[in-house]
Amino acid sequence: MDLEALRKEFEDCECGHKHDFDLEALEVAHGNLDRVAEILSAHNFPKKILMVADVNSFRVTKGLYEQLLSAGYIVELRVYDSMKVADMREVEELERELERVDGCLSVGTGSVNDICRLSSFRKDKQFAIFATAPSMDGFASDSAPI
């Protein structure tokens, strides 16, 4: 996907609002689970990261943690038993964990993605998402419905 062309399409929007996004890359393809480390490396994602998932996303991305370690990533892992609704307490906890790393990899969608996205933005850490399900339009946003 040509993100620069997409960005240019929104430069002179008739609604009068400025539309922009800070998205370096988007990879959508069957088999990307086996390429996560390769994709992150190709985009100079930091090697010292916090990987955040819930138990369901962690289960369906079996082997991702080991793949990252094998590729030389230093990975701190946070797996939630269940997260139905994101809240600021979780954001603040993740912000403390992000102080020890250089980037955050959110595995999944929904509330896990919300707290990762917002805490990464607030701590000025690089952020990547490995989406496991279709979701809303919040992937490129720096805010979250918390």
What do these predicted ranges mean?
Residues M1-C104:
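ATP/NTP phosphate-donor binding region
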Residues A86-I146:
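Glycine/threonine-rich beta-strand-loop-alpha-helix active-site module
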